[in-house]
């Protein structure tokens, strides 16, 4: 009896079936059509998705690499880093709650831009005062952490006001997808900044230069946000 290699390979998971390959390709084509439709009809939605994907990766980088910089540059012990992380998360949570009132008063776009601006300034101060010791990092680091939550919360509020009625699920799905797609930026720029700093201060002393990479990511997100204005209510049609 002759075997049926195509069916056997498909059943065993060795080779994807044509139908499965077509399904994957169809998904990418559908995604591309959605992005093109956004760009043509309401480009501000697409610009915000791009801007948010970038600066949200910078926000993630603040928490990811903050402890490393605290330990390698500011003399924190491992226990100090753990205590700081707990306090920073509590502070971030409290400030996020308070920022909800600012969101209603000023609008989410201003909260986003203000939070990112403070993050950039505090990051540059941490870089400039890298020899200030633990007290310096506690003061600047907590101010830095306090702006992460408001930026994240206001981003979701802003998107909810910007997207069209009836397309909330689809656009929030794109919001999550674009965020994952940009997740390489902060690690890459952090590494590049340290690599560049090694030529200036030496490899062993260049750890704090990584924060400049995070700053570049945040600034790029802010620049893209300049293309997005405050929404005047829901967009009613994307087609």
Predicted regions and their residues:
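A membrane-interface helix-boundary motif in multi-pass transporters
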Residues: 192-218
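C-terminal ends and interior cores of transmembrane alpha-helices
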Residues: 117-131
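Hydrophobic core of transmembrane alpha-helices in multi-pass small-molecule transporters
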Residues: 135-150
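Juxtamembrane intracellular "pre-TM" segments in multi-pass secondary transporters
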Residues: 3-50
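Multi-pass alpha-helical transporter architecture, strongest
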Residues: 1, 212-239
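Helix-to-loop junctions at the C-terminal end of transmembrane segments
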Residues: 95-108, 194
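Short amphipathic helix-loop junctions that connect adjacent transmembrane helices
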Residues: 64-81
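Intracellular juxtamembrane helix-capping segments at the cytosolic ends
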Residues: 150-164
């Amino acid at each position: 009896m002759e075997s049926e290699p195509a069916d056997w390979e498909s059943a065993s998971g060795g080779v994807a079936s044509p139908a499965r390959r077509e399904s994957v390709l169809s998904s990418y084509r559908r995604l591309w059509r959605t992005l093109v439709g956004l760009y043509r009809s309401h480009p501000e939605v697409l610009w915000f998705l791009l801007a948010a994907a970038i600066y949200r990766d910078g926000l993630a980088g603040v928490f990811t690499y903050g402890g490393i910089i605290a330990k390698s540059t500011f003399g924190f012990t491992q226990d100090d880093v753990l205590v700081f992380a707990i306090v920073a998360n509590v502070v971030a949570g409290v400030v996020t709650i308070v920022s909800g009132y600012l969101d209603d008063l000023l609008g989410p776009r201003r909260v986003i831009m203000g939070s990112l601006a403070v993050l950039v300034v505090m990051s540059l101060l941490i870089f400039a005062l890298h020899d200030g010791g633990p007290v310096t990092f506690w003061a600047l680091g907590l101010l830095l952490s306090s702006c992460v939550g408001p930026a994240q919360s206001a981003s979701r509020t802003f998107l909810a006001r910007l997207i069209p009625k009836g397309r909330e699920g689809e656009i929030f799905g794109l919001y999550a997808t674009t965020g994952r797609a940009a997740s390489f930026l902060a690690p890459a720029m952090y590494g590049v900044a340290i690599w560049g700093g090694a030529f200036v201060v030496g490899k062993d002393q260049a750890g704090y230069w990584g924060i400049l990479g995070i700053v570049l990511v945040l600034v790029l997100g802010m620049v893209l946000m300049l293309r997005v204005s405050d929404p005047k209510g829901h967009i009613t049609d994307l087609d």
